[in-house]
């Protein structure tokens, strides 16, 4: 019996249990009372609508489930950003579905709501996937209008994207299933086809109260902008539905008729489960963040038949590169090796650190995968690039820049899984959010920061104590420890995967056992979009 394995297993399974507990809370949206009120009106909730629309026997993944987590407390919170986004299948066709959650502030748009909607559109655009909008929103959340209204990546960008996506031939279908007011009224009408539910849905630029105040006209909302008005008088909407299910059934009927398009042509064969037990991941991944482990053992539990053909196996060993298949899809894997390695020259290299040789190897491997049209999968557990005179004299900045250049200019789809540490420039080189991964998710064991909590707290403590001493204050060991603990506590909260997911720095936090599904669905989505751009790294320092 391996005691460390068992300790690791217990710890990591507790993290997954906590993930499930948090997600169960998120699924309640604005709470059970608001859900009950929704049902009393004869309406389905956002999650019920999405689940009814998607093929029940097919897989689906939820994007941004933890958006808004622990944010906006002074406004009552915004669970899941007030909108549900899933990638799944409708009548066998892969789609993105976006549904406003009217149990959260009547579906009003918080800043994070806008960011999440834009992320959903970005995924649709990159992968040429049809996107379905289920609209039930009171519009912009007015107390925070200055953070959602006028900037480039704010509310207005949604409608700009509607227009651009339509010109690209990306199918957009909207169903108005509740309120659709003010600027938000443009979203369904800028879609290819728009549906509206009778009696419970309405569309107008200004509601009855505002109309009365502005021009003195007395009119009820149903007459002003209900289903009959827009389907029979204004011609704004295309289909009238008798209730939510009827609207969703009509969407299924429409999506079923969408024709097929050219594919990217990524290699796909029969899928096989890993030969190694996937549950072992929980015991392999150490509880202690600075402990060593063999990343190869993690890879074997993620890839088909546990087969991984390493590229330059004996060179640049702090990064593992090689070819495999995941659910039948060919992939090139770039993963941080977390155990201490020894080079042929006898040099010991720390796991999780990017050295000159590993950066050089990764750059070449990325180029090879682009040459062969093989999607890239990055498995992050990185503390950064090697520092010190030896590395600087060896040109670590130059070699690191080459790797970042290759990642930046890669034209094959990239997918990033943050397993453990994701620190500093290591995050960049290993395809962090800024480098356009088609999907980026974290395991519950992940941390995202400029540096580790301990390192950051020590640096910040030095700055704080120096400042206090300048003011003539005495710093006792007790006071120093109190300051350190306070700083570290604040920093630890910020490096949590939930902090990152709340701000949509990642697309979600997942059970490690769901990793294959996310990668497989991501590559299938990417296969809808042929690669049009040629791979070119531009000028390199050599």
Regions found by a protein language model. Name each.
Residues 1-542:
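Ligand-binding clefts of soluble mixed alpha/beta catalytic domains
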């Amino acid at each position: 019996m391996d005691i460390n394995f068992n300790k690791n297993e217990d710890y990591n399974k507790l993290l997954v249990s906590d993930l499930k507990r948090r997600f169960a809370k998120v699924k309640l949206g604005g709470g059970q009372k608001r859900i009950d009120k929704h049902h009393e009106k004869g309406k389905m909730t956002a999650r019920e609508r999405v689940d009814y629309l998607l093929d029940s026997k097919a897989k689906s993944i939820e994007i941004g489930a933890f958006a808004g987590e622990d944010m906006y407390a002074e406004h009552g919170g915004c669970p899941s950003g007030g909108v549900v986004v899933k990638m799944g299948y409708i009548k066998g066709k892969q789609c993105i579905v976006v549904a406003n959650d009217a149990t959260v502030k009547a579906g009003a748009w918080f800043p994070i709501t806008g960011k999440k909607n834009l992320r959903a559109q970005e995924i649709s655009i990159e992968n040429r996937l049809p996107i379905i909008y289920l609209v039930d929103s009171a519009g912009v959340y007015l107390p925070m209008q200055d953070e959602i209204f006028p900037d480039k990546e704010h509310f207005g960008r949604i409608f700009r994207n509607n227009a651009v996506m339509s010109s690209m031939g990306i199918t957009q279908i909207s169903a108005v299933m509740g309120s659709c007011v003010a600027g938000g009224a443009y979203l369904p009408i800028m879609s290819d086809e728009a549906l509206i539910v009778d009696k419970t849905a309405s569309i107008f630029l200004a509601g009855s109260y505002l109309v009365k105040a502005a021009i003195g006209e007395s009119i009820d909302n149903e007459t002003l902008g209900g289903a009959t008005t827009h389907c029979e008088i204004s011609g704004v909407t295309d289909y009238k539905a008798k209730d939510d299910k009827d609207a969703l059934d009509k969407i299924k009927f429409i999506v079923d008729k969408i024709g097929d398009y050219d594919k990217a042509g990524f290699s796909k064969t029969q899928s096989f489960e890993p030969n190694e037990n996937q549950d072992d991941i929980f015991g392999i991944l150490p509880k202690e963040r600075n402990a060593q482990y063999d990343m190869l053992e993690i890879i074997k539990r993620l890839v088909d038949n546990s087969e991984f053909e390493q590229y330059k196996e004996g060179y640049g060993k702090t990064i593992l590169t090689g070819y495999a298949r995941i659910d039948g899809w060919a992939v090139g894997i770039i993963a941080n090796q977390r155990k201490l390695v020894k080079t042929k020259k006898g040099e010991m290299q720390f796991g999780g650190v990017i050295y000159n040789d590993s950066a050089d190897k990764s750059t070449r491997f990325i180029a090879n995968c682009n040459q062969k049209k093989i999607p890239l999968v990055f498995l992050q557990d990185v503390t950064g690039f090697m520092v010190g005179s030896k590395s600087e004299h060896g040109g670590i900045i130059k070699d690191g820049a080459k790797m970042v250049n290759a990642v930046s200019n890669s034209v094959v789809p990239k997918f990033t899984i943050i397993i453990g540490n994701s620190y500093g420039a290591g995050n960049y080189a290993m395809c962090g959010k800024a480098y356009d991964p088609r999907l980026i998710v974290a395991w519950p064991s992940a941390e995202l920061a400029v540096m580790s909590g301990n390192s950051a707290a020590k640096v910040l403590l030095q700055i704080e104590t120096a400042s206090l001493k300048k003011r003539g204050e005495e710093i006792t060991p007790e006071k120093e420890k109190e300051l350190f603990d306070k700083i570290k506590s604040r920093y630890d909260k910020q490096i949590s995967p939930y902090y990152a997911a709340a701000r949509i720095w990642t697309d979600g936090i997942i059970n490690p056992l769901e990793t294959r599904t996310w990668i497989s669905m991501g590559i299938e989505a990417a296969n809808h979009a042929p690669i049009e751009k040629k791979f070119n790294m531009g000028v390199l320092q050599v």
